[in-house]
Amino acid sequence: MNQDEHKIVVRRMAGLIAAASVLIAVYVLRLIFLQLVNSDSFKAQATNTTDYNFTVTAARGDIVDSAGRRIAASTTSYNVVLSKLLMGDEDLDAMLQRIVELLEAHGEKWNDSLLIGEPDAAGHYSFTAQADSTSDQKALAAMKDSLGLQQYATADDVMEKLVEDYKLESYPLHWQRVLGGIHYEMQQQAFSNVNNFVMAENVSEVTVATIKENSLTMPGVEIVETSTRSYDEGDIIPHVLGRVGKITAEKWKVTDENGQTTYPLREKGYNMNDMIGVSGLEAVYEDELRGKDGVETITRSSDGVIVGTAMTTVPEPGHTVQLTIDSAFQQAVDKALARNIEMINSTYNSSSSAKAAAGAVVVISTKDGSVLAASNYPSYDQNLFATQYSQYSSDPGLPLLNRALQGLYTPGSTFKPAVAVAALDSGIINRFSTVYCNGVYTYYDDYRPKCTRHGHSGNIDVITAIKWSCNIFFYDVGRRTTSDVYDAYAYKMGLGTRTGVEVNEATGRLTTKNDSNYIASLDVQAAIGQGNTVVTPVQLATYAGTLANRGVRYRTHFVKAILDSNTGETLQETQPEVMDVVEDKGETFDLVREGMKGVAQTIPALAGYPYTIACKTGSPQRSEGLSLIHISEPTRH
């Protein structure tokens, strides 16, 4: 190689080295830019993660008795929930089939409120709604309305509509029914990008584990931890506690008379699938028992793998509602009531008219009107309500009826102390006033009511009249006092009016001159607790408390306090509330109570009791049975 050629080679090599150096420099600078300047952006692109927020249901507050013993509590359970957002482009019906097969393999059930059974051999369907069930027929009508069908539509018509709407023609009849039912349930729960669909509730831990193991192949199928209501003793005041249940479509979407639609529960922060108090104290104290839901954020990669979870908002449990009821005492009263009814039935087994089919007992504290026990017989078990509702609702003994608060009964002679208070307080009679009893009341020519004269006859004063329940005395005193006057006193003492309890109660009624069947003789009938007068057991208990308190009537109540569920701190305490007062003029209540103490001395089981007892029995002429008001004083003999 000559010198000129060597120079050319050197120049070319130098050019190549320079070009390579430039390329290397550009590459290095690009790497620096990617790793240092824009690393976060490219890292996100590489991982391609997405955050999803899920509601974490707060635990519902407990309901406890006066001693703090738990009556109703929340226990953790697991639901299978479908998220439309997470499902993406998955074949929904194919996914539903997989879930159903998985649930069936583990003995689970799924939500399906479609009132249609499986097809018969000919491929026809039938409604499962009971013809004699008002609730079933109402649900059936609502189902047809929601599908845009006429009320005369058959079960086949309903299924044809569902198959057409959700394109289920290619599926066998069995799967058409299964998938059609699930789609209908989705419609009821308003399944959308906003509302998840609760497909199955309270599933087993085995089912939970299986679904989590298959999460990569079942996108959008989530296990959500929630809380369900449970009862340590399901038979303790179930009528008063009430129940929780799912939000119904009617409560979720409200349309007023002007056609305006609102969503009041959504505005209060509820989701459509939430549980809510539907009756009793569970409904009345919903705002206290309901907690504040939390939010859990789940981060998923582009291939569906969960790469992170965080509790964005921690859920707060609801408050504890403490009752005035003592659960041990309540159970003792329940047993005593059942035992006495069984004793009556065994004693009078030859006389159907003397048998006792049902009963109620209410015990209140005279200090402040707090309810210590409220028993119904027959009753039911909260833990069995869902599975045995059909038996409970068809039972002729009406175990679902809250007799203690809503049963209306003729008070009979238990009404007589109210008439005595009215007559004494109004000056119609005094301690020395008497009425002659010869067994027949002869004031009316065409109406001659009688008296048994049990234990008495001749001139009877108010103490003796109450002790021996003399009808003649109260016929005459009632006529002279008039129903206008003694009714006013009875109302003040708690009869024929609301007692103030937190849950639904019947008002009852007293006999008045405004009654369509009123005649003058009704005044004497009503004076012994007959006529048109009907009251509730809780009113009788409130009335007895008013007599014990010398005319002061407190609001009858079941709730003692609202407590912080974490600390036990008292947030709100029920204070004694005076609802009405009968002014005690002189010795009115002393005389009435003296007569009622005399009643106790005529009853062998009470005569030797270690406490002073004042009471009054009543045996109305109607067939409701026996009533009794009973006052125990804390003074030993």
Regions found by a protein language model. Give the residues of each.
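Membrane-proximal periplasmic segments of bacterial cell-envelope enzymes
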Residues: 1-314, 350-360
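Beta-lactam-recognizing serine transpeptidase/beta-lactamase-like catalytic domain environment
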Residues: 72, 78, 299-316, 325, ...
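Short beta->alpha linker loops
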Residues: 202-203, 327-328, 481
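A short acidic, often aromatic-flanked loop/helix-cap motif at beta-alpha or helix-coil junctions
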Residues: 229-231, 330, 508-510
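Bateman/CBS regulatory modules and CBS-like beta-alpha motifs in cytosolic regions of diverse proteins
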Residues: 320-330
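Structural motif corresponding to the C-terminal cap of alpha-helices
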Residues: 336-348, 427, 600
